[in-house]
Amino acid sequence: MKKASILLLFFIVVVSCKQNKHEKAQPTAEKIKFTEIIKEDYELHKPSEEIKGVLILFGGYPENADVIKREFQILDIARENSIAELLSNFNQKLWLEKSEKYQLAKKLQDIIIENKLPTENIFVGGFSSGGVVSLLISDFIIGMKQFYIDPKGVFIVDSPIDLTALYKSSEKNIERNFSEPSIQESIWLLEILGNNFGNPKDNIAKYENSAVFTCSTNNISNLKKLKRTKIRLYTEPDTLWWKENRMADYEQMNAFYIKKLSESLIEKGYESVEYIPTIDKGYRANGERHPHSWSIVDKKDLVNWILNK
């Protein structure tokens, strides 16, 4: 698609991120043997022997498995800890239709069965729009008895979780007329959201039915099955960077709505919610400074979370 580069913090979907240069994998005494399986729609790296956990990753709007590997270099740490890693090529989704949820859930379960992966310690996570997919598909799987791959935990990395806010932010960007790329992306977003849901002023319920979170109405109906699931919400609220580079206000940033979501989940009794804001960790794999990046995640800490250490 012409606008496949769309990312979104400031509610514009951007390409992914960079490995945190300060994290280094700790060597193990014994090299764990791994099997690499590459298919058209996914890539799987699994230990040949004991598997202590399964990590399923979804990339940002235009990202496939190769880009995820480049921007989120967690393979070595996962390997050292006997964690299987499934990198999905499923992308370009700001929300999921019910049919898409079913097809994706079935696909994931088929992969897990086919590759004899354990189902008791599955974690799902994603960057940007991939985080939206992660939350929505996890909620769907847990709510459907025919699926038995319930995620034990789910995490997002600076994801555009509020579609209503995304629509309104796009209107601001066009009115502000700050940069041509921003204007073009916002025009595309208004078109795709408007065509599917209309204007949120007139059709807020349609937005609520599809979004992870609608801040203006405090709606989290698409996360109701995750009340006992471990949840991590990563974001880097660098207001100065966004002001200088996009002329974006804090209320236009993914970080603003991620924080609001964490507060709403905790208030409503969700058992294990962690809001994780970072400072100066956002860099792309090419060294470019960008707070909207995979690299804000501490990979070693994430693995410890998966292993419950």
Region annotations inferred by a language model:
Residues 17-53:
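A domain-start/cap signature at the N-terminus of enzymes
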Residues 39-51, 109, 115-116, 219-221:
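Short beta-strand-to-loop junctions in surface cap/lid or active-site-entrance loops
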Residues 51-61:
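Short beta-strand element of the alpha/beta-hydrolase
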Residues 62, 171-223:
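Mobile cap/lid helix-loop segments that gate and shape the active-site cleft of serine hydrolases
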Residues 67-86:
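Short amphipathic alpha-helix adjacent to the substrate-entry channel of hydrolases
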Residues 95-116, 136:
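Alpha/beta-hydrolase active-site loop
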Residues 96-97, 229-243, 255-309:
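C-terminal catalytic histidine-bearing segment of alpha/beta-hydrolase fold enzymes
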Residues 113-114, 120-178:
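Primarily recognizes the serine-hydrolase "nucleophile elbow" in alpha/beta-hydrolase
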